[in-house]
Swiss-Prot record:
[4Fe-4S] cluster 2 binds at C61, C90, C93, C96. It is a peripheral membrane protein. NDH-1 is composed of 14 different subunits. Subunits NuoA, H, J, K, L, M, N constitute the membrane sector of the complex. The gene is nuoI2. It comes from the Bacteria. InterPro entries: 4Fe4S_Fe-S-bd (IPR017896), 4Fe4S_Fe_S_CS (IPR017900), NADH_quinone_OxRdtase_chainI (IPR010226). This is NADH-quinone oxidoreductase subunit I 2. It holds the Pfam family Fer4_7. NDH-1 shuttles electrons from NADH, via FMN and iron-sulfur (Fe-S) centers, to quinones in the respiratory chain. The immediate electron acceptor for the enzyme in this species is believed to be ubiquinone. Couples the redox reaction to proton translocation (for every two electrons transferred, four hydrogen ions are translocated across the cytoplasmic membrane), and thus conserves the redox energy in a proton gradient.
């Protein structure tokens, strides 16, 4: 009997409580600052693509939704000839962003990717490239890749020193 009265009181309180429903397209709830949404490819400050087609993003992707085809410029620099992401399979885990050595792949807070056809959720390189530098303005991979840091140079290790 006590359980029934408790239930009736709880329902009575909830009837007069304010609603928490949000009319979604017109009103949007605030997203967390680090929300992971749509993936974009960024550019260097000089306007070139940051992606070097190393395929680390595709290897890190747990659902295998990234496909990269590598090409090479006459001066020997790699670039993605095609870069495709299937957002129908993407789980927005962020592993591709973490694996990217050049900060070319970045996740934006844009989470509205719904579509009526699954084929429209496959984005090509042209759809993913943005004109800006993304989260890391001024960063250029080729300025820091392979350069020695002053004071960090060490002598080569003798393998015999590693033995007990």
């Amino acid at each position: 009997m006590k359980g029934i009265l408790d239930s009736i009181l709880r329902v009575g309180r909830m009837i007069f409580a304010p609603t928490k429903t949000v009319q979604y397209p017109e009103e949007k709830l605030p997203l967390a600052p680090r929300t992971r949404g749509r993936i974009v490819l960024t550019r260097d400050p000089d306007g070139q693509e940051r992606c070097v087609a190393c395929n680390l993003c595709a290897a890190a992707c747990p659902v295998d939704c990234i496909d990269v085809v590598k090409a090479e410029t006459p001066d020997g620099r790699w670039y993605p000839e095609s870069f495709r992401i299937n957002f129908a399979r993407c789980i927005f885990c962020g592993y591709c962003e973490e694996a990217c050595p050049t900060s070319a792949i970045q996740l934006t807070p844009d989470v509205e990717l719904a579509d009526y056809r699954r084929g429209f959720l496959q984005y090509e390189k042209e759809d993913l490239l943005i004109s800006g530098e993304g989260k890391h303005p001024g960063y250029r991979y080729w300025d820091v890749a392979g350069k020695a840091i002053a004071g960090k140079a060490q002598d080569p290790v003798d393998p015999k020193d590693l033995c007990p």
